[in-house]
Amino acid sequence: MKEEVKGIPVRVALRCRPLVSKEIKEGCQTCLSFVPGEPQVVVGNDKSFTYDFVFDPSTEQEEVFNTAVAPLIKGVFKGYNATVLAYGQTGSGKTYSMGGAYTAEQEHDSAIGVIPRVIQLLFKEINKKSDFEFTLKVSYLEIYNEEILDLLCSSREKATQINIREDPKEGIKIVGLTEKTVLVASDTVSCLEQGNNSRTVASTAMNSQSSRSHAIFTISIEQRKKNDKNSSFRSKLHLVDLAGSERQKKTKAEGDRLREGININRGLLCLGNVISALGDDKKGNFVPYRDSKLTRLLQDSLGGNSHTLMIACVSPADSNLEETLNTLRYADRARKIKNKPIINIDPQAAELNHLKQQVQQLQILLLQAHGGTLPGDINVEPSENLQSLMEKNQSLVEENEKLSRGLSEAAGQTAQMLERIILTEQANEKMNAKLEELRRHAACKVDLQKLVETLEDQELKENIEIICNLQQVIAQLSDEAAACMTATIDTAGEADTQVQSSPDTSRSSDVFSTQHALRQAQMSKELIELNKALALKEALAKKMTQNDNQLQPIQFQYQDNIKNLESEVLSLQREKEELVLELQTAKKDANQAKLSERRRKRLQELEGQIADLKKKLQEQSKLLKLKESTEHTVSKLNQEIRMMKNQRVQLMRQMKEDAEKFRQWKQQKDKEVIQLKERDRKRQYELLKLERNFQKQSNVLRRKTEEAAAANKRLKDALQKQKEVAEKRKETQSRGMESTAARMKNWLGNEIEVMVSTEEAKRHLNGLLEERKILAQDVAQLKEKRESGENPPLKLRRRTFSYDEIHGQDSGAEDSIAKQIESLETELELRSAQIADLQQKLLDAESEDRPKQRWESIATILEAKCAIKYLVGELVSSKILVSKLESSLNQSKASCIDVQKMLFEEQNHFAKIETELKEELVKVEQQHQEKVLYLLSQLQQSQMTEKQLEESVSEKEQQLLSTLKCQEEELRKMQEVCEQNQQLLQENSAIKQKLTLLQVASKQKPHLTRNIFQSPDSSFEYIPPKPKPCRIKEKCLEQSFAVEGLQYYSEPSVAEQDNEDSDDHADEEWIPTKLVKVSKKSIQGCSCKGWCGNKQCGCRKQKSDCNVSCSCDPTKCRNRHQNQDNSDAIELNQDSENSFKLEDPTEVTSGLSFFHPICATPSSKILKEMCDADQVQLKQPVFVSSSDHPELKSIASESQENKAIGKKKKRALASNTSFFSGCSPIQEESH
């Protein structure tokens, strides 16, 4: 018996989660508002929805469970089925609400979801009912990509055995699903935890732990009274955690994730269609439960025998407003569903009758499934053109098959021949090895013919004759081996050309056999090329081995020479070290000067001998390295030969395997052909039978056709009358058709424009959401920088700041960051207001009744025709445009395929050229080895001639050495005299410097040897010197160069200013003298004509400043310091520190100075005159005699010239009030 109750609606609970951190960072705002004390939620400004329960973001899990779910559990113990369904967008909190990620460790956690709380409540109620016996069974499944997977089964293979069956009395059953009997709550929790671990979860852009499947946790409860065994109740509790609906542009899913999302949305769409059908009475009784497996499993829960609660989970963020609105509408439609739950009573007799009825129904279904008819074939005769093309095609196919057969046979024969060649090569290698052993035994060649003549023993003579014959046989065998090697190379080349010249076969009907033949031909070609390359490599290796054997004696000889040379070098090195030590000791002792000179000469001789020996040693080592490189090349060639042989063996094995597979395939195909022929015979028999039946039916149809013709004639007359009436009606309707068409066209155009503008608004809304997300990220970054104390970036979005704001003090930086944050937050609020306004307009435009109102405006068939005509015209134009685009796309694809074919051909051509180049390279290497062998033989001959020359030259060298020693002794004596002369010159220059310093200290005019500064690139100028009485012209033997002489003329003394008139008188007696050109080695400083601004200047290139020794123009020079004169004066004081100290005339000390200098900068004219005077001084040469006292003579000869230079300087300084006018100006510090 079943006790029926009234239909009750599906209860709906709305739960809203709080904003997550990602949404807060993106600047999302809340788009939902809740009415206090009422189960009502408002979207935007005026869009409201009412449900059974509404839970705002602050509601806890326990309140949700006690308010909405707990009443269902009490009905379960009364025999009612119950379902708790969680639906919503991905990331809206469904799994959190249901407790899909629950573990045993979270038992006392307040945030546990619905499923663990249901388990606790169930066992709590069971413990209270002691007069009932309970049997609880648990099952857990998931629907992943429209496949049912058992989460309690360890192996996923059982998933193929799970099927859905429908029982008219008990409802939906799942056959093959694992059900576990549980006794306590911990067993149930362990089953839940096991299923949660097996459930498919993945990460998307919206949720890091997104459920990728629909999960259903079912608890089956059977309760019996202990006193009455016949009365029992059965009930099921389904706890459903649906996967969230998602959009690909937000989740950014790809690959498997995208496929999963498509299947999830498909299942939810079918569920929505079922909910719409159940909630709308106008659509009739048909409900599309069979569109997906999810709706079939929930068939009892929606509109069936169950108390159902739907928990709609939504996100409050305005970026998810569209999905939130869809969820709210979805839940609102679910409230209209009416379920009819009943108490499930299960007596045994009712169960038996039910099973019998089920068997009968299944038998009927089975009989119906075996019935059916075969459709008749339609024979169409081909045209003559088609027939000729088919015949031509058949002939080409037969020819192709014949050619492919011949190609496969030729490939097989080639493979066999190549295998034989490989075997003969292996035998040949063994014979060559034995032949090599015989050659080694025959290495010591003896003139056996003479030995036979001298021997007397007859038996010994016979043995020696046999040995002679064997030697002749060995020589013949070696010649034959060389000929065979060349023959194999030639045959490999011929076979290669044969394979290459084979014609390309077209595609035959039997694709597999053609591919097999082509593969065999390709592998045969590769094998031939491999044999050819192997033969070339072996010949090259053999040639290089012969060269190595010939190099062996040369190597031993060179090794001995290297040892001898190294010993000689060591002995000479020791002798050199001893001489160096003796020279060092001799320097300390002045009496051993001659002996040290001999030792120094001997040291130079030893160094020359050591250099010659090292050179010879290096040449010998080069030849040894050549031997090592050839050995390395030979080993590398042998390794390549081994690899090529292995490759050849693998290729042969592959060819055999391919042939075996082809043989098996051919055998199987022959067997299938026999079976098909047998079936064809049976079909021919059935066809004859059907033809007889068809003949009988055609006779019956002929009679019926005649009857139908008579009825047709009567019908024609009736239709003619109806046509006349229709034409009259059409004339009346055509008048109003034109106005209707125009009206429908305008209306459809307006509707399409509204839909297009709605889509554009959605696009603008997405753009605003992205902009707000970027602004929120900028605000978060600025706040982090403000907390960390960093300066703001140089460039910020939507605002620019001045240089002072960016690089100001810390307080200014903090103010700028605060202003930027304030500005961005203002823009963020503006974007949020724009988003809310757009969303509200979209809500108004996309009302739920809009599609219904749109089609209800078409009331008559005439309006529908006009609308369809307009839409068809638009569709045709769009189709034409699509076809044009497709044709252009196909053309581009065809051109791309042609380009790919050309590329493939070019690649093949390149590979062919590469193989030819490798062969040429091997041949060139052979020629190189032959040349090396020839050069080595020439080298031996040249060494022999060198030894003979060395023996003849050794006697002449001894005579030359004796004369060389005598000359060395004379040179040592001369060197000692030069050293003494140098010491005297140094003492003379030191005395000269002291003399000039004394003259300066006594305020007399210094008489120094003037230095010659002649620029290397300046022209030689002849300046006539002053006349000197009784001047003796002497040959210049030595040129002196002193920088100190210029430093004394930089600042004239007060006494020189007083004697200005006398100097002017002396200048009139000036006599020209001939200049002497100075060598470039004695010149210091640069001689630039320009600004000294780049590295062409010698001073700047050496990273030094230009000074007075430079011949550049000081007015143009940019490489001089302003305080050059002061630094020169300081250096002069430091040089004369040992004798006395000169005071700086520019230094002014309060109370000590005898006058106060006037601060005045020199004019450009004065500077130019002084620079000209300095240049004249630099360019005038001097003659230095080599008498007993050359320094004193030079001072006397230059006294007249020094007066002329001093006169020009005094004239320049007299024009100003201070002698500071000739110096560089010094910047005064502001006090």
Curated annotation (Swiss-Prot):
- List-wise, which residues carry Phosphothreonine? 800
Modified positions (Phosphoserine) in chain numbering: 395, 802, 811, 816, 1224, 1230
Cellular compartments annotated: Nucleus; Chromosome; Cytoplasm, Cytoskeleton
- Which note does the record give on the cofactor? Binds 1 [4Fe-4S] cluster. In the presence of oxygen, the [4Fe-4S] cluster may be converted to [2Fe-2S].
Q: Provide the residue positions that the database annotates as binding ATP.
A: 88-95
InterPro entries xrefs:
Kinesin-like_fam (IPR027640), Kinesin_motor_CS (IPR019821), Kinesin_motor_dom (IPR001752), Kinesin_motor_dom_sf (IPR036961), P-loop_NTPase (IPR027417), Tesmin/TSO1-like_CXC (IPR033467)
Where does the record place a coiled coil? 351-1000
Tissue expr = Expressed in pyramidal cells in juvenile hippocampus, granular cells in juvenile cerebellar cortex and in adult spleen.
SMART domains cross-referenced by the UniProt entry: CXC, KISc
Cofactor(s), names only, from the UniProt record: [2Fe-2S] cluster; [4Fe-4S] cluster
Q: Which Pfam families match?
A: Kinesin (PF00225)
What molecular functions are annotated in GO for this chain?
Answer: ATP binding; DNA binding; iron-sulfur cluster binding; metal ion binding; microtubule binding; microtubule motor activity
Disordered, as annotated region:
1189-1212
Region Globular: which residues?
A: 1001-1231
> Keyword Chloroplast on this protein?
no
All copies of domain Kinesin motor, residue ranges: 9-337
- Tree of life domain: Eukaryota
The entry's family comment says: Belongs to the TRAFAC class myosin-kinesin ATPase superfamily. Kinesin family. Chromokinesin subfamily.
Describe the function of this protein: Iron-sulfur (Fe-S) cluster binding motor protein that has a role in chromosome segregation during mitosis. Required for mitotic chromosomal positioning and bipolar spindle stabilization.
This one is known as Chromosome-associated kinesin KIF4
Species source reads Mus musculus
